[in-house]
C-alpha cells in the first residue's frame, strides 16, 4: 500500500510532447515512444473515448519509510460529446456552478498536478487493477479518488498497474472493461524505458523534457498553448505565494471554503434517494425535486387530517341528535353553589372501546372549562383531546378521554360527571 500524492513538478510534464501526428504515432513502434507520446498513443488509438490519462510513478520516502504515488505526466483530451455548455445556458443552477468552478472534469484533472495539499489522497495497491463503470460503482467504491472523480462527472475510472507505478484513465462515458486494452497498456509501459526516479530526501521528481522543433502541425500547436498557459499560471501563483504570505493565506482560505462546500454536497448526496448524475448541478436539481415532493406529501397529509377532523365532528353531531338509551340528555337544575350557581348543565356521553366522547353544554359563568377539567381529573379520566367554543352565553365543550375500567358504562360515566360538576 502506498499514498497517492500529487507532485508540483508540472513544468517538465507539460512540455514533454512532440509534434508527431496521430497517424505517425499509430504507425510507429509504441516501445520507442517517450512518455508523453505513450500517453497520447494509449488514448488516441483506443476505440473508446477517454477524457484524460495520467501516469503516477511509485516513489519511496526514506524519512517516513513509506511508498507513494507521484504525478509524472498526463494528457487531457476532454469530452468530445460534451453538451454541458447547452445545459449551462438553459439551467440557472448549472450556470451558477459553471461560473464558480468551470468544467468539473478538467478541474478534476488539473487538480491532480497542482499540489499535494490541494487534492485527495488514497492508499492503493500497486498490484490491483481498478475498473469502475457507472455512477453507482464510483459512488460506493472504497477508492476515495473514485468518489471524487464521480462527483466531477467521471463515469469510468481505470487504474492499471505497471512496473513502476500506475496508469489512470477517466472518461465521462460508461466504458465496459476490456482485457485487450489493459494488456496493451501494460505492454506499452511495461516494455518502455521510462526514466526511473528515486526520492530519498522526500522531494518530488522532475520528469525529463523531450526535445522538439519549433515547426509542427496546428493540432499540437493549440495543445502547446493550452499547456503553457496552465504552466504560466501555476508558476505565477507559486511565486506570489512564496513572496506574499497574505496571498498564501487567501489561497488556504479559498481551499478550506471549497472543501467545506464539497463536504456539504457529500451530505446532500447522502440524503437524496435518487441521484440522476454525479455532478453538482444534477445533485442540486435532484435535491430541489425531492424537497418539492416532500412538500407535496406534507400538504396531502394536512388535507387528510382536516378531513378526518371534519368527519369526527359530523359523527359527534349526528350522535347527539339521535335519542337512544345510550344517548340521553339530562337537564339538571343545579343548586346554587360556589362553583356554578344558577346554571343549566347538559351532558352527552358516547363510549367507544376504552375512550369516551363527552359533550358538556353550560352557561359561560364561573369558568366552566376549568370546572370540567377538574372534574375529569377527580374521576381519573385522562384527557386525549379537548375543544371549547362559546355561542353567545353558552359554552360548549367536546372532550375525548380514556375511561378507567370502573366507569366504562355510559350511564355510570354521565351520572358521575354530572354529580362531580354539581358539587
From Swiss-Prot:
Residues 318-327 have a biased composition (Low complexity). It is found in: Nucleus. One of its GO terms (biological process) is regulation of DNA-templated transcription. Residues 245-294 form the bHLH domain. Keywords: DNA-binding, Nucleus, Transcription, Transcription regulation. Its main location: nucleus. GO terms for molecular function: DNA binding; DNA-binding transcription factor activity; protein dimerization activity. One of its GO terms (cellular component) is nucleus. Residues 192-243, 312-343 are annotated as: Disordered. Gene3D superfamilies: Helix-loop-helix DNA-binding domain (4.10.280.10). Pfam families: bHLH-MYC_N, HLH. This is Transcription factor bHLH14. It comes from Arabidopsis thaliana (Mouse-ear cress). The gene is BHLH14.
